[in-house]
Amino acid sequence: MAALDGLPPLRDVIQRHGLDARKALGQNFLLDLNLTQKIARTAGALEDATVFEVGPGPGGLTRAILALGARKVIAIERDTRCLPALAEIADHYPGRLEVIEGDALKTDFETLAPQGPIKIIANLPYNVGTQLLVNWLLPKAWPPFWQSLTLMFQKEVGERIVANEDDDHYGRLGVLCGWRTEARMAFDVPPQAFTPPPKVTSTVVQLTPRENPIPCAVSNLEKVTQAAFGQRRKMLRQSLKPLGGERLLVKAGIDPARRAETLSVKEFCLLANSL
């Protein structure tokens, strides 16, 4: 990457700015610049896109996104220690990197989004990644403001995102992702690619919005998935009792003796629409 963008190696940047990944912030710095380029390429053509990045840290992925030609990167960083390193990247790419100090969970991404294609590419902090994904999946208006999500998670979370019915990993997250997006696991990232190395393998997931998901009220789908998977080993007549139980299931044409993990996304939407 140094030969590609003329900036110093990331290890030098981290040492010079006294940066260390903090567990409390869910940080694991990705220092393998071949991998950061691979992640950025997974998002497809970037030349006309504005890219949101969450938790850029010392900027390894940020540099890859900019080097591959993104029109602009808007990076949300909570850790003020990382801001000087990111400022150096901004100086190297005048007018193309905007760094916003703040909490991504409290950030209104849609309001910040300029006109044109929007992509979100991020090595998400482990402690907020799933909630951020759910936030991006559940706006009332659809299609969303973003064109694609290219996100790194712990592999176990990635498996939940892409899971279908009758899969051990299938749950509320799989239903929400399958309802509104087409999701795939692109590739795994080993622990040794990070500083410090996490205890688990990570994976990069690519999500693109479905143009016409099954019509369904977001709030109702959240209710039925939360109730059904909250007691996933019980029959639906029992787990959905607070929402109407057997009466609701009969109305939706679903056998009350089935369990949550056997229902397809379409069937969960039938339940939500029967509330």
UniProtKB/Swiss-Prot annotation:
Its EC number is 2.1.1.182. The keyword Transferase applies. InterPro entries: KsgA/Erm, rRNA_Ade_diMease-like_C, rRNA_Ade_Mease_Trfase_CS, rRNA_Ade_methylase_Trfase_N, rRNA_adenine_dimethylase, SAM-dependent_MTases_sf. One of its GO terms (molecular function) is RNA binding. PROSITE patterns: RRNA_A_DIMETH, SAM_RNA_A_N6_MT. The keyword Cytoplasm applies. Belongs to the class I-like SAM-binding methyltransferase superfamily. rRNA adenine N(6)-methyltransferase family. RsmA subfamily. NCBIfam families: ksgA. This is Ribosomal RNA small subunit methyltransferase A. It comes from Rhizobium johnstonii (strain DSM 114642 / LMG 32736 / 3841). The gene is rsmA.
